[in-house]
Design a protein with these regions (language model features):
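Preference for long, amphipathic alpha-helical scaffolds in soluble/luminal domains
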Residues: 2-10, 19-148
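Short regulatory/linker helices and ligand/cofactor-binding micro-motifs at input modules
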Residues: 13
Length: 148
């Protein structure tokens, strides 16, 4: 009876510890990916798909990224929003959604970016769905993230 209990405990211990090696390897891979992204996308910009998505991915990961990487991005977004008087696109409202996701990922408020509320355009149903269902889907995701 004692052997069965010890065997069961050993098996349970192995099952519990089995994912630990995979998690450690995953962390190493994740850090390598983060290093690659920050060296490849050195100045993420609004309207640059790789820039916005890179900020989202890095901010939502557990990787260490210099604070200046995100604060510089936020400053560039604010300047771009001011330069275009808050109109990121007349037709592609997924632009708003993507920027909102990036800003919320770094803890910024998308309802006041250079004095402009980037959430407001997503309330225009016709323009939001102009790109099809993706427009509506990304708008809902962006609006949801902005409330957290």
């Amino acid at each position: 009876m004692k052997k069965r209990i010890v065997s069961a405990l050993l098996a349970l211990t192995l099952l519990v510890l089995l994912p630990c090696g995979a998690l450690a390897a995953g962390t190493t891979e994740l850090d390598g990916t983060a290093a690659y992204l920050t060296s490849t996308v050195t100045r993420p910009e609004l309207g640059s798909v790789s820039g916005d998505w890179t900020v989202i991915g890095l901010a939502r990961s557990a990787c260490r990224v210099p604070d200046s990487y995100f604060s510089d991005y936020a400053q560039r977004v604010e300047q771009t929003v001011k330069d275009c008087a808050g109109v990121l696109s007349e037709r592609k409202y997924t632009e708003y959604s993507r920027v909102i996701l990036a800003l919320t990922a770094i803890g910024k408020n998308p309802s006041n970016v250079g004095g402009y509320n980037l959430l407001r355009p997503l309330g225009d149903y016709e323009k939001t769905v102009y790109q099809g269902i993706n427009g509506a889907i990304w708008a809902l995701i962006a609006l949801d993230r902005s409330r957290r």
